[in-house]
């Protein structure tokens, strides 16, 4: 079991999500639409300055895990990629062309390690509140909490281990978003919602 690199140095990572063009989700069953995607960072002030912690063998925090990009940009790019991959257009501000407005409040984007006797457990959590509003019926909103998690066992824990754990949790978050029946229902035309 090795935690490679100096545990006293911050780890800089670049988490991301890439949509698989050969794999679509239930979002593809919807009529193509223009979606305004708004991302807000609701994390605590302690968690806003980093996206995780490196822990030593005693469980104490030895360094921070820092993202090379703002968390709001990571979420915007991930959800945009998934919506685009399923035939929808994403814009950053509501307009007359907008069918739905999706507001995402990021509550958690976090990774850390736990040293065990024979291995290192890498954990990550991605959690956000999703609100979908219909332009034609602004009073009609859907609010849902979506979470993605990852727990991976490793023998070595370098910077890439933290990034891989967050990428796995982010992928799970996007999959949950794209397959959630309440979210799909909120995207449907009000006349056809069931």
Residue map of PLM features:
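A structural "domain/chain start" motif
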Residues: 4-73, 182-194
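Short, well-structured alpha-helical interface segments that form or flank functional binding sites
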Residues: 74, 97-99, 168
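Short secondary-structure boundary motifs at beta->alpha junctions and helix caps
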Residues: 56-70, 136-183
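A mature extracytoplasmic/lumenal domain signature
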Residues: 39-41, 106-110, 146-148
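Amphipathic alpha-helical segments
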Residues: 73-85
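Surface-exposed short loop/turn segments
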Residues: 7-20, 86, 90-141, 151-153
């Amino acid at each position: 079991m090795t935690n490679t690199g100096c545990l006293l140095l911050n780890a800089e990572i670049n988490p991301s999500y890439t949509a698989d063009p050969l794999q679509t989700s239930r979002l593809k069953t919807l009529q193509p639409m223009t979606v305004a995607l708004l991302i807000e960072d609701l994390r605590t002030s302690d968690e806003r300055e980093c996206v995780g912690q490196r822990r030593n063998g005693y469980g104490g925090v030895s360094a921070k895990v820092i993202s090379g990009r703002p968390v709001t940009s990571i979420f915007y790019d991930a959800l945009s990629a998934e919506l685009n991959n399923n035939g929808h257009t994403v814009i950053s501000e509501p307009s007359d062309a907008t069918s739905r407005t999706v507001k995402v409040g990021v509550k958690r984007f976090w990774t850390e390690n736990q040293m065990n006797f024979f291995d290192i457990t890498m954990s990550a959590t991605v959690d956000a509140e999703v609100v979908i509003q219909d332009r034609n019926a602004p009073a009609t909103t859907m609010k849902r909490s979506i979470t993605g998690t990852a727990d991976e066992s490793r023998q070595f824990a370098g910077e890439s281990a933290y990034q891989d754990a967050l990428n796995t949790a982010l992928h799970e978050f996007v999959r949950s978003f794209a397959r959630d029946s309440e979210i799909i229902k909120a995207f449907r035309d009000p006349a056809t919602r069931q």
